[in-house]
Curated annotation (Swiss-Prot):
Disulfide topology: none
InterPro entries: NTF2-like_dom_sf, UPF0225, YchJ-like_M
Pfam families, sorted: YchJ_M-like
Lineage per the UniProt record: Bacteria, Pseudomonadati, Pseudomonadota, Betaproteobacteria, Burkholderiales
Taxonomy, superkingdom: Bacteria
Protein's name according to its UniProt entry: UPF0225 protein Bpro_4182
Family that this chain belongs to: Belongs to the UPF0225 family.
């Protein structure tokens, strides 16, 4: 099992606690992935971080549930062997009460290929008490 998936390991999203140490998955994004109905992400950045963790853990159910219905694909297929290497949140902008943007860089590596960076500015909307990923522009 990869270290990022071990119980007690730091959250794959890389968020740091007040002590400057990585938060455990259960105290960070795990609470959103494992209790979707009862614990919605409080802001667009938290949702984006939890969606990154859902990619790391191949949680298509969470990714689809947090994708806005206007843009949601019918299914998600994960590329076999992809290793997610890290996430850097560059900016979180609250545009108004129901719209936000998050700029981030996620790194991944596929078997037999060099590592790649996904640089995206994602758009989010808040509806019915939840944040949803709408779409994004890659750079």
């Amino acid at each position: 099992m990869p270290a990022a998936l071990l119980p007690g390991a730091g959250c794959p999203c890389g968020r740091l606690g007040a002590s400057g140490k990585p938060l455990a998955f259960a105290q960070c994004c795990g609470r959103y992935l494992d209790d979707f109905a009862g614990t919605p992400a409080p802001d667009a950045e938290s949702l984006m971080r939890s969606r990154y963790c859902a990619f790391v853990r191949e949680r298509a159910d969470y990714l689809l549930a947090t994708w806005h219905a206007s843009q949601r694909p019918p299914s998600i297929d994960f590329d076999p062997g992809v290793k997610w290497l890290g996430l850097e949140v560059r900016q979180h902008r609250q545009l108004d009460a129901t719209h936000a943007e998050v700029e981030f860089v996620a790194r991944q590596k596929s078997p037999g290929s060099p590592a790649v960076r996904l640089h995206e500015r994602s758009r989010f909307v808040h509806e019915a008490g939840r944040w949803y990923y709408v779409d994004g522009d890659t750079r």
